[in-house]
């Protein structure tokens, strides 16, 4: 193509006006036109005109002034140019971004204007671009000044401040006293046991038993128990409006010594007069016998009473329905008492006796005595305000911080990780009952802690203050100041000459706590009027009203406020809420401090950056304003304000050209040229040529140029990826992951919360909870069981048939063996029953009085028979002949002699000695025969051969032993002599 054709083509393509109204110049078409024909002067001249038009005017005039000249040249030389047909629509780009597409020629674009001729080179360049596959592109029109903005002036940054008034000090925390009031009491009573026993012929059984406790009279306590350590065996008691009398062992009244009891619990002592009960059984059967036992018992036990102290209980299980603080004094008369006045007695200067040591107390006491229907109770009277207290000390805190926050005080205790909240007004101890002990214990504990830890470093800045915290905890707090801070305060007071205001300066909250209240007016404050003659009626009315007020005040007794008018402080059983409050306050303080410091630092940083923004907006206003507004805008500085226009998002396609070179061989584009459409599905007529800006911004002009340089390398962001150009020619796409990122953000380094462990705390221990009731039931059960063991001989009255139990056990055993075993068991049990019955009969006979008498007589008869038998045996041993044959005695012999006419004085020489010797031998033989028979019987019984042999040998020996038997004479010599 000739140069003229190039000029016409270039002029025709470059005469399109954009939104800015400037004529766009295209120099990329000249290299692709055909070379002009040789000798074509007009073409060469038009080429020169084209080059002239392509060169920028030195004066900067717009190309519109030369439009007429260019149009005229084109009309004259139009026929010398060869026009090539182009396709109606450009083919879509191939899948490869860098590939060049080919199109057919010879087709005219119907969308062109009638006067516009399609240029195939222009379409070829357009189709050689790279389509942006993803990403958002924007186009920004130039600002005209219709919308202007300004940068905000610097702000005033907040200062970090907690906004609290902290005060350190020492505190003592009190809780509700749920433990009962304990004291020692003495119980006096006499235990009466009346038994009725039935005596049968062979058995004795307990038919009835009556047991009762009766009180010991106060006079007997004075005269015997506390005076001598003894007690009377007589008991007087009123039952059913009848006065009854009982005597121990049914005998006359005597004084018995009180001895320590064998059975006593660890927390109590007891004394009694006897350990046995009397059970009398007479000798006559088939009748009842009644016996009485009186045991005087004195017990020293523990007594308990709980608020409102209108009764107290004893460890014996007895409950006294009277206040332990009741007495005859003025302040004690208002206490509760359910008994008649004659049952109560109070003794001043009483000295009780110790029944163990038998010594009286050295210090006298005020003793109260109450006589109930069953016992008499005595205890030492004390004043209620001194002994009883509804609050008790829970914790001593050596380091406490109090701060005021939103109209309340917060007491933080780090040692137990707890925070208590209370009102800013102090709590009056007079509004709670029985709190006199609080001030004393609090002062002692605080002074002790101060002397141990803070005496050399701190000074007190006020008196003890009392605050009622949530949960029912009373906090006794005394503020302190360090010595250094106290010196600063003193120097300030001396400098300002306000030494009289030292206390208020050291403790500024003291005035707020001591709120003055308006005194209520009453008729008592009005002096009693004196009657006058002028106003008698009015003075009488005032006199009556004043009198009624005095009577009402006297009846109410305002000096002694009852417990019903006061509110008892109730304490929760757990302080988990206080521990959670401490944790929340700790976290809140840390977070608030952190956020406050961040806010202050952030504000300071923004003020410093504002100066940088103000200077940077002069260099690149569009980028600065877009970053500030977080929106794509085009900006231009108009003096002290900035004109902006909002950028429009490109909905159509954006094509990136492969080359960044311009028509001038020495000039190149500094940013890649693009072709885009504003809307989707737009034809070639709606395509716009522009240039790729920063952050996917599309310029509608291609005015960013630079001199061409060697070894040029550029990376440009195109959509969501980057494109790489080398020597002003597209090379490839670069993913963002291949490019290393350097962060411009500043990391925010925050301090984490410190670790804090929650310690389990018990407001009331297990022992305290078990000790809250009036009665200790375990102590009662032990006492009752041991009390039953005091009379340990009761079981001796009741007989238990243990034989029947044994027989039943044997019968059960045999039944388990089957039918055969049951038959054998019946036989065995029958025989055993007979034996047992016999033995039982004998035992019953022996238990019977008549049986005992018969046994006694039999024993005596046996002894007499034994005596005579013993005498007979001794007689046989001394003179067996006389015992066995009394005829041989001397008396018979003398009688025989007398019958024959002989005198008693005759000599005994006439006695026949031979016969006497024969008699002796016969007796000896008889004894040996008797012994032999016994030996033979034993041998036969034992069935032993040795015994039989010995018996036979003895028989043989007896046969050979002794003189030979001689026959006696037929006639007696004496008879013969008499006959002569």
Curated annotation (Swiss-Prot):
Query: What residue spans carry the region label Disordered?
Result: 1-20, 88-118, 505-535
Q: Say if the entry is tagged with keyword Cell inner membrane.
A: no
Give TM segment ranges: 850-870
The residues the entry assigns to the signal sequence are 1-86
Residues forming the motif Golgi targeting are: 925-928
GO terms of biological process kind? symbiont entry into host cell; virion attachment to host cell
**Where can the motif Internalization motif be found?**
965-968
Name the domain of life this protein comes from. Answer: Viruses
User: Where does the record place the region Involved in fusion and/or binding to host membrane?
Assistant: 197-203, 282-290
Function as written in the Swiss-Prot or TrEMBL entry: Envelope glycoprotein that forms spikes at the surface of virion envelope. Essential for the initial attachment to heparan sulfate moieties of the host cell surface proteoglycans. Involved in fusion of viral and cellular membranes leading to virus entry into the host cell. Following initial binding to its host receptors, membrane fusion is mediated by the fusion machinery composed at least of gB and the heterodimer gH/gL. May be involved in the fusion between the virion envelope and the outer nuclear membrane during virion egress.
Q: Describe its assembly.
A: Homotrimer; disulfide-linked. Binds to heparan sulfate proteoglycans. Interacts with gH/gL heterodimer.
| Similarity-based family | Belongs to the herpesviridae glycoprotein B family.
The protein here is known as: Envelope glycoprotein B
């Amino acid at each position: 193509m000739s140069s003229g054709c190039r000029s016409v083509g270039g002029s025709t393509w470059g005469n399109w006006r954009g939104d800015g109204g400037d004529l766009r110049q295209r120099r990329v078409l000249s290299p692709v036109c055909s070379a002009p024909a040789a000798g074509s002067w007009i073409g060469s001249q038009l080429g020169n005109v084209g080059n002239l038009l392509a060169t920028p005017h030195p004066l900067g005039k717009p190309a519109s002034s030369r439009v007429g000249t260019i149009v005229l040249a084109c009309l004259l030389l139009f026929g010398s140019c060869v026009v090539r047909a182009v396709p109606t629509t450009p083919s879509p780009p191939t899948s490869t971004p860098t590939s060049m597409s080919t199109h057919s020629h010879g087709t005219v674009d119907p969308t062109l204007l009638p006067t516009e001729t399609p240029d195939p080179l222009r379409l070829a360049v357009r189709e050689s671009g790279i389509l942006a596959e993803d990403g958002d592109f924007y186009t920004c029109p130039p600002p005209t000044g219709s919308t202007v903005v300004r940068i905000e002036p610097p702000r005033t940054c907040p200062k970090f401040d907690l906004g609290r008034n902290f005060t350190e000090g020492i505190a003592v925390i009190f809780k509700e006293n749920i433990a009962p009031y304990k004291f020692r009491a003495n119980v006096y009573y006499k235990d009466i046991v009346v038994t009725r026993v039935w005596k049968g012929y062979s058995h004795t059984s307990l038919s009835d038993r009556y047991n009762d406790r009766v009180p010991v009279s106060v006079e007997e306590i004075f005269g015997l128990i506390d005076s001598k350590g003894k007690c009377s065996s007589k008991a007087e008691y009123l039952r059913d409006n009848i006065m009854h009398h009982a005597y121990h062992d049914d005998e006359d009244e005597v004084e018995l010594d009180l001895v320590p009891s064998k059975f006593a619990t660890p927390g109590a002592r007891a004394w009694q007069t006897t350990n046995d009960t009397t059970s009398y059984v007479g000798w006559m059967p088939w009748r009842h016998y009644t016996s009485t036992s009186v045991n005087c018992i004195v017990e020293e036990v523990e007594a308990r009473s709980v608020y409102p102290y209108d009764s107290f209980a004893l460890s014996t299980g007895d409950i006294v329905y009277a206040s332990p603080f009741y007495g005859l004094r003025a302040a004690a008369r208002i206490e509760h008492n359910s008994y008649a006045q004659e049952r109560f007695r109070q003794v001043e200067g009483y000295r009780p006796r110790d029944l163990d040591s038998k010594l009286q107390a050295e210090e006298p006491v005020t003793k109260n005595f109450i006589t109930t229907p069953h016992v008499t109770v005595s205890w030492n009277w004390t004043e209620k305000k001194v002994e009883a207290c509804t609050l008790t000390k829970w914790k001593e805190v050596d380091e406490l911080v109090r701060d005021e926050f939103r109209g309340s005080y917060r007491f933080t205790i780090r040692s137990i990780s707890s925070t208590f909240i209370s009102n800013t007004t102090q709590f009056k101890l007079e509004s709670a009952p029985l709190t006199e002990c609080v001030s004393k214990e609090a002062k002692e504990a605080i002074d002790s802690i101060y002397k141990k830890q803070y005496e050399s470093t701190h000074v007190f800045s006020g008196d003890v203050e009392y605050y009622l915290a949530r949960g029912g905890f009373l906090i006794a707090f005394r503020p302190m100041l360090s010595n250094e801070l106290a010196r600063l305060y003193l120097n300030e007071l001396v400098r300002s000459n306000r030494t009289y205001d030292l206390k208020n300066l050291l403790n500024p909250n003291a005035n707020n706590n001591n709120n003055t209240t308006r005194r209520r007016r009453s008729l008592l404050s009005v002096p009693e009027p004196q009657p006058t003659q002028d106003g008698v009626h009015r003075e009488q009315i005032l006199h009556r009203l004043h009198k009624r007020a005095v009577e009402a005040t006297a009846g109410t007794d305002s000096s002694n406020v009852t417990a019903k008018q006061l509110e008892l402080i109730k304490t929760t059983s757990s302080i988990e809420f206080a521990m959670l409050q401490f944790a929340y306050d700790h976290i809140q303080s840390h977070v608030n401090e952190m956020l406050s410091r961040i806010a202050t630092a952030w504000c300071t940083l923004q003020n410093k950056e504002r100066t940088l923004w103000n200077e940077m907006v002069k260099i690149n206003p569009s980028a600065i304003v877009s970053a500030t507004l977080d929106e794509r805008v085009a900006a231009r500085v108009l003096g002290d304000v900035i004109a902006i226009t909002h950028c429009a998002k490109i909905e159509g396609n954006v094509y990136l050209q492969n080359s960044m070179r311009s028509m001038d061989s020495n000039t190149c584009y500094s940013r890649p040229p693009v072709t885009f459409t504003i809307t989707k599905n737009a034809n070639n007529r709606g395509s716009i040529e522009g240039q790729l800006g920063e952050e996917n911004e599309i310029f509608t002009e291609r005015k960013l140029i630079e001199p061409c340089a060697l070894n040029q390398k550029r990376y440009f962001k195109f959509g969501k990826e980057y494109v790489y150009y080398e020597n002003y020619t597209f090379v490839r796409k670069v993913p963002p992951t291949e490019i290393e990122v350097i962060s411009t953000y500043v990391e925010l380094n925050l301090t984490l919360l410190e670790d804090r462990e929650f310690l389990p705390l018990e407001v009331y221990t297990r022992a305290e909870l078990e000790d809250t009731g009036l009665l200790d039931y375990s102590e009662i059960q032990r006492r009752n069981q041991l009390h039953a063991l005091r009379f340990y001989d009761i079981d001796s009255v009741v007989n238990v048939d243990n034989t029947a139990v044994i027989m039943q056990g044997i019968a059960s055993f045999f039944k388990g063996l089957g039918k055969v075993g049951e038959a054998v068991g019946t036989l065995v049990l029958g025989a055993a029953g007979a034996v047992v019955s016999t033995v039982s009969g004998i035992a019953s006979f022996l238990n019977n009085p008549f049986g005992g008498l018969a046994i006694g007589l039999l024993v005596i008869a046996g002894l007499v028979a034994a005596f005579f038998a013993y005498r007979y045996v001794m007689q046989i041993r001394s003179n067996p002949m006389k015992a066995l044959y009394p005829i041989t005695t001397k008396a018979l012999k003398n009688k025989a002699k007398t019958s024959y006419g002989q005198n008693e004085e005759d000599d005994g020489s006439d006695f026949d000695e031979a016969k006497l010797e024969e008699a002796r031998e016969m007796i000896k033989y008889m004894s040996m025969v008797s012994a032999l028979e016994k030996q033979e019987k034993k041998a036969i019984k034992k069935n032993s051969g040795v015994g039989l042999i010995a018996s036979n040998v003895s028989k043989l020996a007896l046969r050979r032993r002794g003189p030979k038997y001689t026959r006696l004479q037929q006639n007696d010599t004496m008879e013969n002599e008499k006959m002569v």
